[in-house]
Amino acid sequence: MTERQVECVLIEIPQGSRNKYEYDKERKVIRFDRMLFSSIVYPCDYGFFPDTLALDGDPLDAMVLMWEPTFPGCVIDVHPVAMLDMEDDKGRDEKILCVPQRDPLWNYIKTIEQVPPHLLKEITHFFETYKNLERKDVVVYGWRDLETARKVIQEAKDRYTEQKKLSNQ
């Protein structure tokens, strides 16, 4: 088996929150963006991989399975395990599912097959419905395996590096 990949995730939104926080690149702070219009809460900690660029122009999204929620601005070393393939009004919007490297309640999980099936359904349902009352369309295509997640992470890192090179010219 290949060695487990360790990545860094910056948390914007803790599990159980209806508040949508976003990282403000210019000010280098976490800002309150809005409260979700629906009476549902984030099913896991949510943030992004620093120094990445996803297809939607933002850093690549990450979800981290935690026993207890963390806080906006918390940095966690994680192992990717899968990817939720979806699209929103800005286009493709992949989200990488991760487990904390140093949490014995979750870090045994290496692949999507080890994630509790009902939890995957809850996460899918959240992303299918969380923008309904805003009248924004979201399409969830389904879960993808670890290899797909790794590929998308590497592509987002490469895209970020390329953009940084171009902006320095």
Swiss-Prot record:
Cellular compartments annotated: Cytoplasm
This protein's encoding gene: ppa
Binding sites annotated in the UniProt record for substrate: K20, R34, Y46, Y130
HAMAP family according to UniProt: Inorganic_PPase
EC number of this enzyme: 3.6.1.1
Quaternary structure annotation from Swiss-Prot or TrEMBL: Homohexamer.
Name of protein: Inorganic pyrophosphatase
Catalytic reaction list: diphosphate + H2O = 2 phosphate + H(+)
Predominant subcellular localization, coarse grouping: cytoplasm
InterPro entries attached to this UniProt entry: Pyrophosphatase, Pyrophosphatase_sf
Binding site for Mg(2+) 1: D56, D61, D93
GO-annotated biological processes: phosphate-containing compound metabolic process
Keywords for the protein's UniProt record, in alphabetical order: Cytoplasm, Hydrolase, Magnesium, Metal-binding
Family indicated by similarity: Belongs to the PPase family.
Top-level taxon: Archaea
Positions bound to Mg(2+) 2: D61
Listed GO CC annotations: cytoplasm
